[in-house]
Amino acid sequence: MNIVLFEASELTSDHKITLADRRYAHLRDVLKCVEGDRVRVGMINGAKGTGQILSMTTATVDLHVEINEAPLPCHPTTLVLALPRPKMLRRILRSCAEFGVQDIHIIHSYRVEKSFWQSPLLEPKKIRQALLVGLERSG
């Protein structure tokens, strides 16, 4: 994770966010952050900046967020993709988000197994999650 992404609804009026999910676990276990450290943050569908760790408990981390950078533009690229195996689709979606692909169209073709269309990965929530993981890696 090269950037901590958050929803606008998570940001309080005093520019703070509290994390208690996988983002918190990553900051604690992988990055080994401590109070006072700065991390890159970005608002989903918004700008990016830095966040300073105010406090860390055994369950949450509080960040003070300063948004001061414009978001990177998307590449004007459209990907037309015959539905691959579900495991590969997750990887492809992550990579597309990392590279800033603007549009992704998933289509059926002669060689696509019909059972692939029943995959839970095609649920909007799962697609969004795969794209967010890619965005977090892109930084």
Predicted segment positions?
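N-terminal positively charged helical leader segments and presequences
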Residues: M1-E69
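RNA substrate-binding interface of SAM-dependent RNA methyltransferases
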Residues: P71-G139
